[in-house]
Amino acid sequence: MFEYELTLPSESDAEALIHVENECFSIPLTVEQISAQIRDERFILICARNSKQELVAYAGMYYVLDEGYITNVAVLPEARRLHAADALMEKLEQMSVEKGLSFISLEVRESNTPAISLYEKHGYKTAGIRKDYYQAPKENALIMTKKLSEEKN
């Protein structure tokens, strides 16, 4: 299994994060949006770096009160199926429990079966559908959720 160093980003990581965004999403975030997330105290952003210290993946989550909302899990194509997303999901959950969150949700494209499998593997359940949520191309989103409260007791 590949080992990743999981780090919190600094402003100097914005360009590398944008590279991952551009490789993974049809409508990527801008440098300004990424920089705002890095500075936002209610946003958790975790980077996965390979043995060469290259940023190959990241995950982001907003949280308010006891709820978290995963905005992105992005992995460069050459790093997929090498467990970077697993490491990021585990770290997000660990940090969520540490912050006292009891519930996490996310949206995922209906056609993104690898991501759906990843989320199910980590205990997420489909809770509903958002019609035409995604653009470029237009597609429904599955709403997936996970309760953490039982794990805190």
What are these regions (language model features)?
Residues Y119, Y124, M144:
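Conserved active-site tyrosine of GNAT-family acetyltransferases
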Residues E107, K125-L142:
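Conserved catalytic-core motifs of GNAT/GCN5-like acyltransferases
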Residues F2-E78, M89-K91, M95, K99, ...:
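Acetyl-CoA-dependent GNAT
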